[in-house]
Amino acid sequence: VNHNKSSIVAITETWLSSDVPDCACAISGYNLWRKDRATGPGGGVAIYVDSDYCTRRVSELEVDDLEVLWVTIRPKLLPRPLSILVVAVIYCPPWYNAECKNRLNKYIISCLDRMLIKYPDAAIYVMGDFNMLDCSAFTRSMRFSQVVKTATRGGNILDKLFTNCPQCYKSAVILPPIG
């Protein structure tokens, strides 16, 4: 993370629990925001943000049984029309049935609506491991673009990044998995 000078790092399937203190997974120079799976092992999401950036967890958007974490980020410099960055990291487990997937899609759309009303000039990034979730419902209705164009696992694009600001993003580079 430090080697690449990353500003924001989103992680899915952290496998962290409340037994693991933040200091055990801290990275120098970064603030850690995490949401562990509420029940059982596995899952979980986390975001590391450069500690020079003003960051706030948007806990009012969180739902206990969904593995989704939202943060707002205010870097020192942003292109003129942008006021703030909104970042969501999502883990959609492969065992989600159609009802769970539909609920997750509706939740994402609702949260995006709320964020766009509150921050109409925000650049929003929704990223994570979507497994086989059909994201067309929120990409069409919210006019979000999918940035990742190359397969991330096997022949499928499971790890995705959607944004309302594709011109602010370079082409995604697929790296080998960590761990």
For each feature predicted by the language model, list its residue ranges.
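A shared catalytic/ligand-binding motif for oxyanion handling
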Residues: 1-179
